[in-house]
Design a protein with these regions (language model features):
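Conserved Rossmann-fold cofactor-binding substructure of NAD(P)-dependent oxidoreductases
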Residues: 6-20
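N-terminal Rossmann-like NAD(P) cofactor-binding module of classical short-chain dehydrogenase/reductase
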Residues: 24-27, 50-51
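Domain-scale recognition of functional cores that engage charged ligands
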Residues: 98-107
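C-terminal catalytic/substrate-binding lobe primarily of soluble NAD(P)-dependent oxidoreductases
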Residues: 115-421
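Rossmann-fold NAD(P)-binding glycine/threonine-rich loop
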Residues: 36-47, 52-90
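N-terminal glycine-rich "phosphate-gripper" loop used for MgATP/nucleotide binding
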Residues: 7-9, 27-35
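Alpha-helix C-terminal capping/helix-to-coil transition sites in glycosyltransferase folds
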Residues: 21-22, 109
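Local beta-strand N-terminus motif with an aromatic residue
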Residues: 22-23, 92
Length: 421
């Protein structure tokens, strides 16, 4: 039985208490319900909890007058840590940010590191990593492999027989969710190999300081990237995996971060969504009420979603899903490749949480990667995992090179400045 209701700051306790009791599972797929409020409630009432994003009641409050660092997911994660640190790792399981991405991509990152290391040992490309591989010590493994950059690299090529109309926002998932992420500051895990900060970058004053943000929308911050078998340009949309992956892969020595890769989303959505986001910019970020999530009208295309690890002996390595619309409909009728990827990743986390109901507060990187990937594998069309001969300076065609003051670091292709479009 489905019941439609509204949860507000004032009625959260009343509404949740009406439907939930200790031992139940609360699956939070809503937007603009404060994470601290709802996760705190679930913890206090013995309810298992899972969401796909860390939300606030009023994400647009204060607008441009708010410090860019306070408009980041890093800021929200620090608030969550202050709450959950008092729990001592105990209580009902509460997993945050476990959809496809953020979520399953954290496990794909570990699979990619495992596959790279296994191949590198077999091919005689590296030595001295056997212990880190055996222990699945992924921070040290990434460090020893020389991983410098990780893109959550996605290219969605799904097309429909219903063209986007003028002043219509079309997407393959939540329009409101894409809007909020798109207008927020570009945000990324910042690697220890990076030589200089981007223009208008801001650093954080407390916490692990593993991230930076840029005072411009993620939707207008484009980088070069790659998915099988094509080069892409993607938006540096803020996403929780940029925080958790870069945090979990940091190597610390005497309180100093001596190794960390740069980690961020590089998202190229459908042609209709790209046009919609461009139109949104023309409207001065005033979101139209005319919105559509493509589904049954999709006639072709796929959603290539995975992680691109760069800087190791194979140059680049992509691990992820190549699920197309035709195969996704065989798996789950009347659904798109995007919704099948996301829903199955949520299912994977739910399955684990139900089997482990008293594990306290967790991010995706805390879960057993093989087990969770196993739950979702069928619905992702299996996992493609292979090397790629690519870096951001290859095939780069700068039409005004030498005249535009654009400088490239030829000595280190993995500098963030080399990726920027």
């Amino acid at each position: 039985t489905f019941k439609i209701d509204t949860v507000t700051q004032e009625n959260l306790d009343e509404k949740l208490s009406t439907y939930l009791s200790a031992g139940d599972l609360l699956l939070d797929l809503a937007w603009n319900i404060d994470a601290n409020a709802i996760i705190g409630w679930a913890h206090d009432h013995g309810v298992i909890y899972l969401n796909t994003s860390v939300e606030e009641w009023e994400p647009y409050a204060a607008g441009a007058t708010r410090n860019p660092t306070e408009r980041t997911l890093y800021w929200r994660h620090m608030k969550l840590r202050k709450l959950t640190d008092t729990w001592g790792g105990k209580g009902p399981t509460a997993i945050v940010e476990h959809g496809a991405n953020p979520g399953l991509v954290s496990h794909l990152t570990k699979k990619a590191l495992f596959d790279i290391a296994t191949s590198a040992i077999k091919d005689g490309k590296v030595s001295g990593i056997e212990q880190a591989l055996s222990d699945e010590n992924f921070p040290v493994l990434a460090q020893k492999l020389g991983v410098k950059v990780i893109h959550i690299a996605e290219r969605d090529t799904q097309i429909s027989d219903k063209p986007k109309q003028v002043n219509e926002f079309v997407n393959t998932w939540s329009v409101e969710g894409f809007y909020e992420e798109g207008i927020a500051p570009a945000e990324m895990g910042w690697g220890t190999h990076e030589k200089s900060l981007p223009v208008n970058a801001y650093q954080h004053a407390d916490g692990p300081k593993n991230q930076i943000c840029i005072a411009q929308p993620g939707a207008t911050t484009w980088v070069r990237s790659w998915v099988p078998n094509m080069e892409t340009t993607g938006m540096v949309i803020r996403h929780g995996e940029a925080f958790t992956i870069s945090d979990h892969l940091t190597v610390w020595e005497n309180g100093k971060a001596v190794y960390r890769p740069t980690v961020h989303y590089a998202y190229c959505p459908t042609d209709a969504a790209v046009a919609s986001m461009h139109e949104l910019q023309m409207r001065q970020w005033d979101l139209t009420e005319n919105q559509r999530i493509m589904n049954e009208e999709i006639i072709d295309g796929d959603d290539r979603l995975g992680v691109l690890l760069m800087g190791h002996p194979y140059k680049s390595w992509w691990t992820g899903s190549l699920l197309n619309i035709h195969d996704s409909r065989k798996l789950v009728p009347k659904q798109s490749a995007t919704t099948v990827q996301v829903a199955s990743a949520v299912y994977a986390a739910v399955a684990w949480a139900m089997a482990n109901p008293n594990s306290g507060y967790l991010v995706p990187d805390d879960l057993p990667w093989r087990e969770v990937l196993g739950f979702a594998e069928k619905y992702w069309g299996g996992y493609h995992s292979a090397a790629a001969d690519w870096d951001p300076l290859m095939h780069r065609n700068d039409l005004f090179k030498g005249w535009n003051n654009r400088k490239y670091d030829e000595s280190d292709p993995w500098q963030f400045s080399n990726f920027l479009v």
